[in-house]
Amino acid sequence: MHADRATESLASSRKLWQNRFSVPQRPPMKISTRQFASITILDVTGEITLLNSPEIRKAVLGLLREKRVPHLIVNMLDVPYVDSSGVASLVEALKVARDVNSRFALYGLSKSAKNVLELTHLLRVFEVHQTEQEALEAPQPLAGRDKSNSESA
């Protein structure tokens, strides 16, 4: 009987701890693509973190290496946060885009995502636009080599 009481107490304490200190569940990241002539837009929704950065990495690298898309634009309007592993995935995508002579651009960066890229001195490395229209109408440089748009975004 004493063991049952201890087990109940332990279970109760564990549940209380989990309720107080658990990380809130966030919606999963979603990725989809759209096509405008030779331009592929990758729509990303949700945070890009250590837990899901392999998903965006797989999607982007598949488009660049396997499908050889000439122009890839990543829609980040619905990405509130990017951690260091997400940044690493974007940097790898940029490198692969350059290797395969594809254009790689970002648009719609949240303030948080933009700050991360600024702090890491990567904002000027990427081709960055504020809107989809700007990204679609921009000259078609290869893989972020034209830095003129990154300063205005």
For each predicted feature, which ranges?
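Short beta-strand/loop segment at the start of cytosolic alpha/beta domains
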Residues: L10-D43, S152
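Amphipathic alpha-helical interaction surfaces in cytosolic regulatory modules
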Residues: E47-F126
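Short acidic-hydrophobic, aromatic-tinged amphipathic segments that line or gate anion-handling sites
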Residues: E127-T131
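Targeting/processing segments of secretory and organellar proteins
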Residues: A6-E8
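Residues at or immediately preceding the N-termini of alpha-helices
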Residues: S53, E132-Q133
